[in-house]
Amino acid sequence: SSSFGIFAGSDFDIEEAMRVALGEVKSIDFGALKEIAGMNPILAKRFYHETGSMFWLEIDLCPLEKVKEISSSYTSQPGVVGQLLLTIPTNGETEEQNRKLCQEATAASKGFEIITGFAPRSWEIVNLSKEVIALEKIRNENPELAGDPVARKEVQARLAEAHGLLEAEVMRLMDGTIWHRANEAPKRYRQNELNLLASTIADKHFCKTPVVLNELINRVRPSSNANAAQNALLRRMLSHENSERLGIEGFPAEAGLYESVLKLSGLHKKSGKEFVIAKPSKSDPCRFLPLWDAAEELLRSDEKLFSMSDVFKLWQSPPYGVKNGILQLLGTAFVLTMRENLAIYREEVFQTRLTDLEIELLTINPSKIQIRWMNL
């Protein structure tokens, strides 16, 4: 027997909307393209496993015509050891022009490494990007889609497919890219080779990074629980210096920090009949001694007051690269181990000793705590 049914339909002309939207996409926003393509940084994995500190290479896309400008003006962010710049020819440049500009851009980079690259058929990414942008325009700028679930579903499906194709194309380009490094022959890198490259560059720029194998605290932004544990440990460094394990009983959160930083490094150790907080030695497995030496050299360079933020800035810069999360712990240990040669100030007012108030300010605003070297 025959029957009738009701099926959902749509009056929205997606093909016409795509034609109009593509016509309105005149250029590519390369910043947006990086986000659309889901490009993740290249992690320095070996360096991380050896030191506990995470560094990485940024990946960015740029038009070939601007690669020299971008390379020469690049400024690094915390944790970044360099940048991979994948160039896209937007003005019909030849492969030879691409190669020449990439080499010149690499030579023009200053400080941290800029590694430039190009891949055959990289213009395909431009077409896919325009399609993604056009579909997003259709989705966001056509209010009639709100009342048309069939068309809305079709647009969303096409957008998801376009995103997938774009991400796949970026991965294909990365695999086929010829990369240019200063003073080296151009070459292709597989994914694992890029990770090794990131570690090699991290070795070069951060050769004196301390070894802190505690991922809760050795990071740019520790969790609130990690910060609370560190604060508890800092207070115990003041009140229980001469006690074993700083008087910590059991295994609360601060005990893990104590074991992995203070005890392992020898910053807190037994001397005679009691425990003391002592300057790190050359045999310290955490490699803290270069930090102490650098801070002492800074303080000895001038008789003025130096804020703890000056010391922290030094420790964060190459070749040390100390992460924000562990600065307060190391800063407190430095002041305590060098107290016989340091005058301590809070907001430029002399203090006879380090107290909980200075520790709190050291955590909140280290610029308010100052120190001066005294030749006794």
How does the language model describe each region?
Residues 1-376:
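Extended alpha-helical scaffold and adjacent linker segments that couple domains
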